[in-house]
Amino acid sequence: MTSPGVSTIQSGNEMRALLFSGGIDSTTIAWRLKPEKLLFVDYGQVAATGELRAARSIAKAIDRELDIRSVSLRQFGSGSMAGDLSSSNTVLEFWPYRNQALITVAAMAYADLPISSILIGTVSGDGDRHADGTAEFVETMNRLLGMQGGPMLEAPAIEVTSEQLIADTRVPLSALGWTFSCHTGEWACGTCAGCLKHDQIMQRLGQEG
């Protein structure tokens, strides 16, 4: 049975592009939907090398070419993801409008291709921490893209948790072992928010992260 919120519909010659970080959620969506385009964006995040290593492994496993783009946004971020813990901003992860920027980059990258939708790896609960994890954000960005004739924005797993998404997709644990969620560098630190979430999910699935 398909879980609510996990879209599988596609028709005709339409193509889908997934913003792909090599993390658990985007990996599970990639494994399930096999979108035609997997877009990895190095926007200056300090974990880009680790994310890219994971993304390449997973793209190869599902027989998809990884499209790698670089856009320097580090000067606009602070906190662990930007490698700047000295900022006066007290939020550990502060990169204002980051997801809006990445979605816009995806729309720009594929403006000359018949891309029907851009997929993002938002899951249930993301909106409890960040406004860009809400259905309202997805709907608003979708309208904005549509104003310029762009593709639709979809969050196919926004109604399910990471664990529900994994169970429904039946992605192998071995593939999940390739995923990378650290915010602080090329190798998992084990203590940042990304690593803690990754480890919690893997432990619930019966395998240490």
Stretches with model-predicted labels:
Residues 2-209:
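Nucleotide-activated chemistry modules centered on ATP-dependent adenylation/adenylyltransferase
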